[in-house]
Structure formats: C-alpha cells, structure tokens
Amino acid sequence: MTTGQGGRQDQLWVSAARFDELVADALDGIPAPLARAMNNVVVLTEDSHPEEPDLLGLYEGVPLTERTLDYAGNLPDRITLYREPLMSFCADEDELVHEVMVTVVHEVAHHFGIDDAALHELGWG
C-alpha cells in the first residue's frame, strides 16, 4: 500500500487514458525476469480508493512468498493505482511519470513478498 503525503496547490490533471499509458510504461520498465515471475496478478487503475482517498496504490492478494502447494484456482491478485491522489501529489507530468513508476515498483514488490520496511531500506518506500 502506498499513500500520498499531501496534495499540491498547482493541480496536475491527466486523462484516465493517459494515466493508463503511464502505468503501462512503468510496467514495461519492469525487468523481464521479474515480469515473467509475476504470477496470477492483474494491474488496474481507478480514480481513487473509496475509503482511503490519499492512497496511491494497493496490492491485494497472496504474495508469492506465502503461496503454498495448494494455491490453485484463485482469482488474480490485484494491483491498483489511483489516478487522482497520484495527480494531486505531483506538480507536472514528469513527476507523475516518476511517482507512477515508484508506486508500480512498490506494489509489485508486495506481490513478491517484500514488505514496506524492506522497501524503505532499499529506497523505494
């Protein structure tokens, strides 16, 4: 889970379609061996989380490190990136590109079983 740290006064706006492109570009930047190792996960975008409006991204599922031999037939894990809080966190599209990439890395890391403490130690918190 990634949360913002307060909005900015100069509100950036990008369309939902453009935001989807930025997320797709960030996913394309994941090294091929890691992308191939992502198992049973879907990446979605939404305007905002209904209960936590400052949430930038959210991983929901069973991390690869916690899956057992009987893990089968489950619905895909979900990584959701939230457009509105990410826009409010950024002053321009270049900053948004960076924050989308950081958020994608953060949530994909959770899929691989990397927790927030380890992400902070690695500089991705």
Question: Which residues fall in each region the model found?
Answer:
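Active-site rim/adjacent substrate-binding subdomains
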Residues: M1-E99, H111, A117-H120
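Short alpha-helical catalytic segment bearing the HExxH-like zincin motif
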Residues: E99-E107
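Short hydrophobic/aromatic patches at helix-to-coil boundaries
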Residues: E121-G125
